[in-house]
């Protein structure tokens, strides 16, 4: 489907099931979407301890919203998706990714430019405990490019409540080290703590980097015993397919060859 903004494809793959692509780039697949969405949401949610509100920029496949809705104290999830066609197609063809998230009464769907939505929310005084940038890559010229610039990252910072955190894709650090480092450094211009995670995402065919950023929440330092107790208390221990208490520290343990990419400056805790 060619929408007003991009070319949208959902096709069948023998290994990955239904695969969702935008402008030729794979965004998610039924078989392994849980990996990226759990890693984008649960490390910072567990470290926070009591998230009640969340904002997703992008996320038209509903996967991030689905993970946020699994948090027991979550009262509100706002999803700001540029393209109504993405949501329409995802609702029909990607139920194994969104699991009906868009029909949950706690979800508010805003169709429009993510930067404009964030600035409007900020200017109205709205603040969120968690923020997920679930977007296409940060290439110049992509529909999401402005969100990764100074104005977009400052708006994201300003939308967070005290103690809040955001997550965002840095991309494949081995294949695109310059892009990953640039995003890392840009985040450091707006947040005191910027911490990279890496995880293998099969459909991307690469080790993938995801950052969590906050002024005060040290996600990386979360105590393993606390995480295990919280997962059990929230009835998520065993329910999640990727994230668990033992994985938390491992996500932040960078391979040695990637450590120089993210060291230095004021961008690491």
Residue ranges of model-derived segments:
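SAM/dcSAM-binding transferase cores
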Residues: 1-12, 209-269
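The AdoMet/dcAdoMet-binding core of the Class I SAM-like
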Residues: 3, 28-165, 174-184
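Glycine-rich, charged/polar anion/phosphate-binding loops
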Residues: 6, 115-116, 195-199
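Short, aliphatic-rich beta-strand segments
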Residues: 8-11, 17-23
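Short strand-connecting beta-turns/loops that link adjacent beta-strands
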Residues: 15-16, 162
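Conserved Class I S-adenosyl-L-methionine
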Residues: 153-154, 179-201, 211
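Structural detector of well-ordered beta-strand residues that form the stable sheet scaffold
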Residues: 166-167, 195
């Amino acid at each position: 489907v060619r929408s007003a903004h991009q070319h949208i494809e959902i096709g069948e793959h023998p290994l990955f099931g239904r695969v969702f692509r935008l402008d030729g780039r794979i965004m998610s697949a039924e078989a392994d979407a849980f990996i990226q969405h759990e890693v984008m949401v649960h490390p910072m949610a567990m470290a926070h301890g009591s998230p009640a509100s969340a904002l997703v920029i992008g996320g038209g496949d509903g996967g991030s919203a689905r993970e946020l809705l699994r948090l027991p104290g979550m009262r509100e999830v706002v999803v700001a998706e540029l393209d109504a066609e993405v949501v329409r197609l995802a609702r029909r063809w990607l139920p194994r990714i969104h699991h009906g998230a868009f029909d949950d009464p706690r979800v508010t769907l805003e169709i429009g430019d993510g930067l404009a939505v964030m600035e409007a929310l900020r200017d109205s005084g709205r603040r969120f405990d968690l923020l997920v940038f679930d977007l296409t890559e940060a290439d110049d010229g992509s529909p999401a490019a402005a969100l990764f610039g100074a104005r977009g990252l400052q708006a994201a910072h300003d939308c967070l409540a005290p103690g809040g955190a955001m997550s965002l894709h840095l991309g494949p650090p081995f294949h695109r080290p310059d892009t990953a480092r640039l995003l890392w450094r840009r985040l450091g211009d707006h947040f005191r703590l910027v911490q990279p995670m890496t995880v293998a995402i099969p459909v991307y065919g690469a080790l993938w980097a995801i950052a969590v950023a906050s002024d005060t929440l040290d996600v990386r330092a979360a105590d393993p015993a606390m995480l295990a107790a919280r997962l059990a208390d929230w009835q998520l221990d065993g329910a999640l397919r990727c994230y668990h208490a033992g994985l938390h520290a491992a996500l932040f343990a960078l391979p040695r060859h990637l450590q120089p990419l993210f060291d230095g400056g004021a961008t690491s805790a």
